[in-house]
């Protein structure tokens, strides 16, 4: 029996201070019951809240060292719940877990986003029986309670098959509930919510850590045996645990001003991160594509499958490194297209014992923490052998299967299956993959006699295809330089096979194989810079993204390109510094410069340059340039303005395909493609600042200040997010009415996000107007008017009328100005932070739209933190006096860590 589920032997005396239900759990386990035996786990373990935790950013403080003696286990393959994880789109979702894991909060978030009802199982029991569980137990015999419990549970699940989020407490996972949940999980997502010991102990207000630890060890296998998915609620620390500065006698007026100007971490930020993580997890794990597109950021590369792009990279990180070190996860992922988590932890030296008992929770915690800090897909890869570099020990079939199946519970975008295992093992994995894509992996430690020409490799590829893999990854150590040319021939050989073929990742490992890694087109494993010292150990790659990219440009596969910001007055632009820093860290020899012109004709200079890669478009040419375009993105066409131009070098075939193939390649320009990323930056900032209490619903109201190009982008961002009631105020009413008519004429029902055609746009004619009585107060405000003096026009010094900001739950205000940064509007909103208002300014929006432009220009992921840092540094150098506050800017960056969207 695997230690993953084997109950620790306990004496009954160990449980003397636990309540009767806890003692029953320990006694039953002590008598040898397996994880699949129905066990009573209900308990009233003190008072608790279901609130989620607080925030600590993206620094990875190795919380798993504490887990090593604190949490539970994997469930044996024969006891674990195996389902296909394919669900009808409207299937109700069940959340289970012990008290204090945050189930109720997560249910509310999920229901608000999906438009579903929350059903609390305990309240349902009380409604059906007229008694709460505790009272019913006291008034009836145990057998009567069990009988009634079974009836109520069956009724609960049968009555709520669709469009509900069902929250089950410990009482629902007793004897009868386990069986019914396992049956329900065949057609519905049943998600086990997990949390760390310290947070659970805090919420339960339990003093004895050891007793809570024992209960977690025992309850884990039970909950896993009747659920098909698992979400680890990562508790963040450092905010709620700290005394507020406002409570200190040293809190000065200067402190108050800095606090207002750096107010990005509002009290709801911890909930916001949790909300984003959980909604993304549910969309991924259930295969809800429309909701997934809504949860993912609208960056261009999110819309393209990785396997369809050229020269993509997977940052490869062993879980052992994350468990043992304080790691900056965002730095590890920077510019990569995927994050590969290698499960390389060693098993116990016995096939019977399998792996360590705490491993399941460590893996779940690691996956959740990594996901919090990345925006790219995750590849979950279990090493087939442990200690691979010294006396390798192959995992047992059961151990390998347990680890991979546990990974599938976590809903990774990709999971690998090792093709060295038997078909019977691999079929179990592939049959339960759900929405995850499967990469068939095969790594030779000793190359076959004929190397890549050996028929064995094609046979392995065909076997992976027959098993149902979505991609194939093959690798062997290089013994000569010629092996690098041989693997190229092998990839070509696969392409020439008849019928549709799977994407192939094929390369040589080791120092001699680095050349093949540079030219492998799909998901080349790369090592993050911070792990270079470990290159060649733990089976890590031997090349970084920067080295791979530099090799492609040095060998003339790709060309150095020139990019610009084009406008009438662009000397103040922060974009050149931001993009040039990004090119450098990515290993690209590109240059981004200012090109200023008093007329639109200045664009001719750009398009005559064969190395022209694209340009940002500034005022006043965002609309003037449209007649010159060969094509436009749907976003730019709807907005009626362009801020990004990309050259077209081939007019044959689809424009999208031509643009993808021509990125980073020089040549004559045949046309121009226009896009708009302003709306992306605005939309991301709205989502970042909008609290869970203000989740977008049909009744949500948005307000636009201004009627220019940025106001157009702001309206489009709101529609894309699903806002159905939008108001415009502009000093010139006629321009506001013209803008409203523009969008009311459009049919945006095919919008890629959660937007719909059922929106209405109204014009407010005066700042003295009361807010319309038939509409809720706005919770989203976007200001697109300049805050500085223009010509003879004085700075507007705009502030919102008090009667327009009476939302009881606050909201978010995005001011697109950053000249100056601390506008009257921003000061007004920051002074209302205690009422739930969040303020974001132009320096929040600018890098976000810049990330999207970088992707459009290069087809590669942007180094987000670096670009943000450069923007703030450049702003510091341009601004004088008190406008720039170094402490404020540092706080701004820290608050954005762990906020990929």
Curated annotation (Swiss-Prot):
<dbReference type="InterPro" id="IPR013785">
    <property type="entry name" value="Aldolase_TIM"/>
</dbReference>
<protein>
    <recommendedName>
        <fullName>Quinate repressor protein</fullName>
    </recommendedName>
</protein>
<dbReference type="Pfam" id="PF18317">
    <property type="entry name" value="SDH_C"/>
</dbReference>
<keyword id="KW-0672">Quinate metabolism</keyword>
<keyword id="KW-0805">Transcription regulation</keyword>
<dbReference type="GO" id="GO:0000122">
    <property type="term" value="P:negative regulation of transcription by RNA polymerase II"/>
</dbReference>
<dbReference type="GO" id="GO:0019631">
    <property type="term" value="P:quinate catabolic process"/>
</dbReference>
<dbReference type="GO" id="GO:0004764">
    <property type="term" value="F:shikimate 3-dehydrogenase (NADP+) activity"/>
</dbReference>
<dbReference type="Pfam" id="PF01488">
    <property type="entry name" value="Shikimate_DH"/>
</dbReference>
<dbReference type="InterPro" id="IPR027417">
    <property type="entry name" value="P-loop_NTPase"/>
</dbReference>
<dbReference type="Pfam" id="PF01202">
    <property type="entry name" value="SKI"/>
</dbReference>
<comment type="similarity">
    <text>In the 2nd section; belongs to the type-I 3-dehydroquinase family.</text>
</comment>
<feature type="region of interest" description="Sufficient for repression">
    <location>
        <begin position="1"/>
        <end position="88"/>
    </location>
</feature>
<dbReference type="GO" id="GO:0003866">
    <property type="term" value="F:3-phosphoshikimate 1-carboxyvinyltransferase activity"/>
</dbReference>
<dbReference type="InterPro" id="IPR046346">
    <property type="entry name" value="Aminoacid_DH-like_N_sf"/>
</dbReference>
<keyword id="KW-0678">Repressor</keyword>
<dbReference type="GO" id="GO:0009423">
    <property type="term" value="P:chorismate biosynthetic process"/>
</dbReference>
<dbReference type="InterPro" id="IPR013708">
    <property type="entry name" value="Shikimate_DH-bd_N"/>
</dbReference>
<dbReference type="InterPro" id="IPR036291">
    <property type="entry name" value="NAD(P)-bd_dom_sf"/>
</dbReference>
<dbReference type="GO" id="GO:0003855">
    <property type="term" value="F:3-dehydroquinate dehydratase activity"/>
</dbReference>
<dbReference type="InterPro" id="IPR001381">
    <property type="entry name" value="DHquinase_I"/>
</dbReference>
<comment type="function">
    <text>Multi-domain repressor protein that negatively regulates transcription of the quinate utilization pathway genes. May mediate its repressor activity by binding directly to the qutA activator protein.</text>
</comment>
<feature type="region of interest" description="Disordered">
    <location>
        <begin position="878"/>
        <end position="901"/>
    </location>
</feature>
<comment type="subunit">
    <text>Interacts with qutA; transcriptional activator of the quinate utilization pathway genes.</text>
</comment>
<comment type="similarity">
    <text>In the N-terminal section; belongs to the shikimate kinase family.</text>
</comment>
<feature type="region of interest" description="Disordered">
    <location>
        <begin position="26"/>
        <end position="59"/>
    </location>
</feature>
<dbReference type="InterPro" id="IPR006151">
    <property type="entry name" value="Shikm_DH/Glu-tRNA_Rdtase"/>
</dbReference>
<feature type="compositionally biased region" description="Polar residues">
    <location>
        <begin position="31"/>
        <end position="43"/>
    </location>
</feature>
<keyword id="KW-0804">Transcription</keyword>
<dbReference type="Pfam" id="PF08501">
    <property type="entry name" value="Shikimate_dh_N"/>
</dbReference>
<dbReference type="Pfam" id="PF01487">
    <property type="entry name" value="DHquinase_I"/>
</dbReference>
<dbReference type="InterPro" id="IPR031322">
    <property type="entry name" value="Shikimate/glucono_kinase"/>
</dbReference>
<dbReference type="InterPro" id="IPR041121">
    <property type="entry name" value="SDH_C"/>
</dbReference>
């Amino acid at each position: 029996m695997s230690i993953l589920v084997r109950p620790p032997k306990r004496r009954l005396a160990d449980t003397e201070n636990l309540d009767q239900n806890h003692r029953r759990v320990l006694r039953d386990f002590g008598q040898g019951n397996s994880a699949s035996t129905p066990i009573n786990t209900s308990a009233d373990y003190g008072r608790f809240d279901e609130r989620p935790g607080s925030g600590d950013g993206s620094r990875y403080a190795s919380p798993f060292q504490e887990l090593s003696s604190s949490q539970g286990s994997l469930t044996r393959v024969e006891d674990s719940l195996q389902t296909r994880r394919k669900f009808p789109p409207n299937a109700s979702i069940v959340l289970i877990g012990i008290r204090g894991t945050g189930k109720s909060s997560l249910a509310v978030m999920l229901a608000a986003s999906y438009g579903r009802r929350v059903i609390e199982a305990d309240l349902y029991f009380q409604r059906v029986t007229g008694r709460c569980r505790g009272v019913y137990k006291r008034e009836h015999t145990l057998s009567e309670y069990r009988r009634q419990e079974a009836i109520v549970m069956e009724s609960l699940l049968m009555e709520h098959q669709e469009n509900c989020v069902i929250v089950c407490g410990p009482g629902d996972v007793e004897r009868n509930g386990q069986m019914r949940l396992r049956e329900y999980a065949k057609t519905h997502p049943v998600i086990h919510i997990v949390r760390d010991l310290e947070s659970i102990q805090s919420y339960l207000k339990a003093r004895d850590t050891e007793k809570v630890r024992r209960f977690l060890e025992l309850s884990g296998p039970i909950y896993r045996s009747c659920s098909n998915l698992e979400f680890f609620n990562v508790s963040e620390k450092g905010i709620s645990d700290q005394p507020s500065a406002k409570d200190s006698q040293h809190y000065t007026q200067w402190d108050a001003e800095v606090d207002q100007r750096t107010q990005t971490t509002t009290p709801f930020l911890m909930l916001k991160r949790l909300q984003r993580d959980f909604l993304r997890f549910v969309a991924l794990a259930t295969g809800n594509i429309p909701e997934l597109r809504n949860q993912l950021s609208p960056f261009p590369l999110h819309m393209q499958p990785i396997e369809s792009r050229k020269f993509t990279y997977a940052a490869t990180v062993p879980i052992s490194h994350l468990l043992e070190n304080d790691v900056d996860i965002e730095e590890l992922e920077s510019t990569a297209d995927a994050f590969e988590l290698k499960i390389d932890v060693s098993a116990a030296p016995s096939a019977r014992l399998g792996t360590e008992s705490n491993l399941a929770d460590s893996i779940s915690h690691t996956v959740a923490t990594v996901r919090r800090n990345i925006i790219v897909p995750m590849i979950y890869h279990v090493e087939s052998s442990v200690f691979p570099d010294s006396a390798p020990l192959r995992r047992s079939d059961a151990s390998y299967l347990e680890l991979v199946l546990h990974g599938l519970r976590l809903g990774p975008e990709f999971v690998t299956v090792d093709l060295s295992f038997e078909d019977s093992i691999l079929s179990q994995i592939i049959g339960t993959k759900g929405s995850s894509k499967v990469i068939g992996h095969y790594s030779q430690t000793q190359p076959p006699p004929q190397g890549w020409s050996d028929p064995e490799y094609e046979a392995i590829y065909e076997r992976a295809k027959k098993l149902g893999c979505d991609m194939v990854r093959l690798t062997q150590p290089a013994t000569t330089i010629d092996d690098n040319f041989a693997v190229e021939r092998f990839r070509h050989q696969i392409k020439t096979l008849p019928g549709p073929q799977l994407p192939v990742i094929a390369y040589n490992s080791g120092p001699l194989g680095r050349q093949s890694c540079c030219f492998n087109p799909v998901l080349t494993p790369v090592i993050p810079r911070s792990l270079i010292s470990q290159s060649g150990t733990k089976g890590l790659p031997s090349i970084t993204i920067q080295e791979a990219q530099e090799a492609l440009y040095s060998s003339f596969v790709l060309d150095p390109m020139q990019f610009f910001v084009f406008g009438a007055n662009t000397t103040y632009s922060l974009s050149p510094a931001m993009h040039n820093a990004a090119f450098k860290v990515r290993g690209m020899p590109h240059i981004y410069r200012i090109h200023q012109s008093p007329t639109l004709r200045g664009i001719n200079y750009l398009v005559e340059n064969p190395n022209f890669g694209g340009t940002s478009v500034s005022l006043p040419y965002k609309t003037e340039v449209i007649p010159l375009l060969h094509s436009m993105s749907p976003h730019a066409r709807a907005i009626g303005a362009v801020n990004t131009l990309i050259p077209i070098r081939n007019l044959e075939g689809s424009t999208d395909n031509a643009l993808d193939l021509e990125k980073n390649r020089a040549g004559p320009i045949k046309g121009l493609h226009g896009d708009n990323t302003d709306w992306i930056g605005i939309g991301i900032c709205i989502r970042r600042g909008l609290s869970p209490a203000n989740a977008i619903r049909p009744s949500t109201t948005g307000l636009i200040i201004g009627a220019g190009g940025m106001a157009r982008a702001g309206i489009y961002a709101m529609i894309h997010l699903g806002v159905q009631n939008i108001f415009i105020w502009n000093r010139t009413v006629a321009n506001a009415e013209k803008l409203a008519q523009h969008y009311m004429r459009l049919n945006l029902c095919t919008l890629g996000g959660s937007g719909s055609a059922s929106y209405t746009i109204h014009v407010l004619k005066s700042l003295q107007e009361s807010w319309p009585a038939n509409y809720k107060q706005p919770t989203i405000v976007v200001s697109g008017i300049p805050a500085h003096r223009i010509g003879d026009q004085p700075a507007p010094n705009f502030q919102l009328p008090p009667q327009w900001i009476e939302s009881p739950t606050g909201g978010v205000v995005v001011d697109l100005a950053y000249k100056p940064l601390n506008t009257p509007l921003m000061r007004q909103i920051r002074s209302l932070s205690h009422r739930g208002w969040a303020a974001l300014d132009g320096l929040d929006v600018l890098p976000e739209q810049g990330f999207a432009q970088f992707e459009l220009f290069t087809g590669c992921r942007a180094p987000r933190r670096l670009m943000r840092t450069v923007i703030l540094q450049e702003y510091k150098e341009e601004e004088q006096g008190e406008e720039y506050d170094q402490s404020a800017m540092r706080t701004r960056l820290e608050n954005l860590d762990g906020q990929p969207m």
